[in-house]
């Protein structure tokens, strides 16, 4: 019995439960990736190049010049309709806020991108699927107005499932509001660049995201209005290979360039320096 107790396999103690996982798995190829390498590679799989979703804070750190970002998005959502589905909307909001640390599905502010003054707005898919409700629409409108007033470029990184159903018509009206706000940017002849990431769908695609002077997209991003499953069921036909992915949209003229995330800032700087009226463009930059 003594020998049996000596060699009996011990179960791990509860003290190891708080030790962070060191590895993550690629959603596309299944490769095991060291987490530190994964984060340093901006959540892009080093084996197959699959672009995983990137938190809004990391996206801002990736694009804004160090030390220049000043956050302006502080609005908090309300529940004017008293909406309840399987649970009250206010409870869903509290859960998303606790999970993301954000008041709503957008993070934005003023910054410089490659020395070019800009308003940068990044949608956060982790918050209610990046859905556009009253707060997201208002923050985008205010961001566009700020860009026009201060002579800044406007850069919006989209990641959204579309309009927020819990806000009904109040959500849908944000489509018109965001589009109208862009007029002020264009009136000042300032550049507006849209970056489409996985996924960009619904009312976001059908409004401000598709109206930029230059539209960049990340590789493999799902971009469209309705999803492929809904379209397939509606038209009762098989869809083309890669339908609604960024490479397919590039081929058919909906986006201007598909850019690897690791080179996205470089591409963005080149575009902004070329288009911003207050910045002298240097060939080769």
From Swiss-Prot:
GO terms for molecular function: acetyl-CoA carboxylase activity; ATP binding; carboxyl- or carbamoyltransferase activity; zinc ion binding. Pathway: Lipid metabolism; malonyl-CoA biosynthesis; malonyl-CoA from acetyl-CoA: step 1/1. The keyword Ribosomal protein does not apply. InterPro entries: AcCoA_carboxyl_beta, Acetyl_CoA_COase_Trfase_b_su, ClpP/crotonase-like_dom_sf, COA_CT_N, Znf-ACC. It is found in: Cytoplasm. PROSITE patterns: COA_CT_NTER. Residues 22-285 form the CoA carboxyltransferase N-terminal domain. Its cofactor is Zn(2+). Its EC number is 2.1.3.15. Pfam families: Carboxyl_trans, Zn_ribbon_ACC. A zinc finger (C4-type) spans 26-48. It catalyses: N(6)-carboxybiotinyl-L-lysyl-[protein] + acetyl-CoA = N(6)-biotinyl-L-lysyl-[protein] + malonyl-CoA. Binds 1 zinc ion per subunit. It is an enzyme of class 2 (transferase). Keywords: ATP-binding, Cytoplasm, Fatty acid biosynthesis, Fatty acid metabolism, Lipid biosynthesis, Lipid metabolism, Metal-binding, Nucleotide-binding, Transferase, Zinc, Zinc-finger. One of its GO terms (cellular component) is acetyl-CoA carboxylase complex. GO terms for biological process: fatty acid biosynthetic process; malonyl-CoA biosynthetic process. Signal peptide: none annotated. Zn(2+) binds at residues 26, 29, 45, 48. Acetyl-CoA carboxylase is a heterohexamer composed of biotin carboxyl carrier protein (AccB), biotin carboxylase (AccC) and two subunits each of ACCase subunit alpha (AccA) and ACCase subunit beta (AccD). Belongs to the AccD/PCCB family. Component of the acetyl coenzyme A carboxylase (ACC) complex. Biotin carboxylase (BC) catalyzes the carboxylation of biotin on its carrier protein (BCCP) and then the CO(2) group is transferred by the transcarboxylase to acetyl-CoA to form malonyl-CoA. NCBIfam families: accD. This is Acetyl-coenzyme A carboxylase carboxyl transferase subunit beta.
């Amino acid at each position: 019995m003594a020998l049996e107790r000596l060699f009996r396999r011990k179960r791990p103690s509860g003290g190891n439960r708080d030790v962070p996982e060191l590895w993550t798995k690629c959603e596309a190829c299944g490769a095991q990736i060291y987490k530190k390498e994964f984060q340093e590679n901006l959540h892009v799989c080093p084996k197959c190049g699959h672009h995983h979703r990137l938190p809004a804070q990391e996206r801002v750190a990736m694009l804004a010049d160090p030390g220049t970002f000043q956050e302006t998005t502080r609005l908090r959502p309300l529940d004017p309709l008293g909406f309840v589905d399987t649970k009250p909307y206010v409870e869903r909001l509290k859960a998303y806020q606790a999970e993301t640390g954000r008041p709503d599905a957008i993070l934005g502010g003023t910054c410089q991108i490659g020395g070019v003054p800009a308003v940068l707005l990044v949608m956060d898919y982790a918050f209610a699927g990046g859905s556009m409700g009253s707060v997201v629409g208002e923050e985008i409108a205010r961001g566009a107005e700020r860009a026009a007033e201060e002579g800044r470029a406007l850069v919006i990184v989209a990641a959204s499932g579309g309009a927020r159903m819990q806000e009904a018509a109040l959500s849908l009206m944000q489509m018109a509001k965001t589009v109208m706000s862009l007029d002020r940017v264009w009136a000042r002849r300032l550049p507006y660049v849209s970056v489409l990431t996985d996924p960009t769908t619904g009312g976001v695609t059908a409004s401000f995201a598709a109206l930029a002077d230059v539209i960049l997209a990340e590789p493999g991003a799902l971009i469209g209005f309705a999803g492929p499953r809904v379209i397939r069921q509606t038209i009762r036909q098989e869809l083309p290979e890669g339908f609604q992915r960024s490479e397919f949209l590039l081929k058919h003229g909906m986006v201007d360039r598909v850019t690897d995330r690791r080179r996205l800032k470089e591409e963005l700087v080149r575009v902004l320096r070329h288009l911003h009226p207050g910045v002298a463009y240097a060939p080769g930059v």
